[in-house]
A protein has these predicted regions:
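Intrinsically disordered, low-complexity segments enriched in serine/proline and basic residues
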Residues: 2-4, 23
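Acidic/proline-rich low-complexity IDRs
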Residues: 11-17, 86, 297, 304
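Short, Lys/Arg-enriched N-terminal segments with co-localized hydrophobic residues
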Residues: 13-33
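Generic low-complexity, intrinsically disordered sequence content enriched
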Residues: 19, 32, 57, 91-94, ...
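Feature for intrinsically disordered/low-complexity regulatory segments and propeptides
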Residues: 34-84, 88, 98, 109-110, ...
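Intrinsically disordered, low-complexity regions enriched in serine/threonine
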Residues: 34-40, 124-128, 140-143, 152-307
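Amphipathic, interaction-prone secondary-structure segments
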Residues: 80-88, 92-145
């Protein structure tokens, strides 16, 4: 097996996947597939529940969802349909919100209009281990169109995955019959989950050897940390299972262990100056979505290679 020429550690097998991380080929991830219509500040207020959220619960965390008018900067051409109205219609179609957040803003006059995110589930898309989630992004200040992404939620570890581009994104501009187009887009994402399930099941059927797992972990580290500097944690740390059921060699388990360890933090690390520290959880919503999406694309690229 040939050696990856740009890996930080010689002798690792080249899995034949390429990644545009810092413009250096290593593993395959399409950056343009990770472009979001919204950008979120770090440490955005987040609320996630085991039961559908009420309007009062949502309003306490993300008041911009209930804006009664667009921001004053919007022109008359801006078709204003509040996210709360769209949410109510989605509820009528069986979609319920289980997580909400909105970005922090420096200007108070934009707080009630700023970008926000809702993760919704349909009653038909929940099973014992995972739930399909539609990730809805929007704003009322012109900084974001309506955008819907596909995601999964693992109950065992409370991890919110993002399904790369296995399921197509849907974007709805603030023009015309916005609510109808958003509902149509939600069903489009919903019907695309079969492809995500096929990818997940195929990952479960693929066994990785130690070298392949290490290469996957190395590429995952490059997605989060500057490739020009040594990562503060090692491949073996992010491959370490946090529960017995995840101690498996299949690609799905390797992917989930890597995702959880990179996003939840809590690992003993060494800074560039040699000081000991503990990795922090990924709290920025935009950063979280981008990293999770990139990790899915990484795993799915390996799945396709191993098929």
């Amino acid at each position: 097996v040939p050696t990856a020429p740009n890996s930080r550690k010689a002798g690792l097998p080249n899995l034949g996947i390429r990644c545009a991380v810092n413009s250096k080929p290593f593993f395959f991830v399409r950056r343009n597939a990770m472009q979001l219509a919204s950008r979120f500040a770090s440490r955005s207020p987040v609320l996630r529940s085991e039961r559908p959220l009420s309007d009062d619960q949502i309003r306490a965390v993300a008041p911009s969802i209930f804006a009664d008018a667009p921001h004053e900067s919007r022109s008359e051409r801006y078709s204003y349909i509040p996210t709360a109205t769209v949410l109510q219609e989605l509820r009528g179609e069986g979609f319920e919100p289980f997580m909400v957040t909105q970005t922090r803003v420096r200007n108070d006059d934009r707080r009630d209009y700023t970008k926000h995110m809702i993760r919704l589930r349909h009653s038909s898309q929940i099973n014992g281990r995972e739930a399909n989630e539609i990730i809805l992004l929007n704003s009322h200040d012109g900084t974001s169109s309506y955008q819907m992404l596909a995601g999964m939620f693992r109950f065992v570890c409370s991890n919110g995955l993002v399904c790369g581009d296995t399921v197509a994104d849907v974007r709805v501009p603030h023009k015309g019959d916005v609510a109808a187009h958003v509902i149509e887009g939600a069903y489009e994402v919903l019907h695309g989950f079969d492809r995500a399930h096929e990818s997940r099941d195929a990952m479960r059927a693929i066994t990785l050897d130690a070298g392949e797992s290490e290469v996957f972990a190395r590429a995952a580290l490059a997605l989060k940390y500057d490739e020009d500097k040594p990562a503060p944690i090692t491949e073996s740390q992010i491959l370490m299972p946090r529960r017995h059921d995840d101690d498996r060699r299949d690609l799905w388990s390797v992917f989930n262990r890597t995702q959880e360890n990179l996003t939840k933090g809590g690992l003993s690390a060494r800074a560039a100056n040699g000081r000991r520290q503990t990795t922090r959880p990924v709290q920025g919503i935009d950063q979280s979505v981008r990293l999770n999406r990139a990790l899915w694309l990484l795993a799915d690229g390996l799945r396709q290679l191993k098929a």
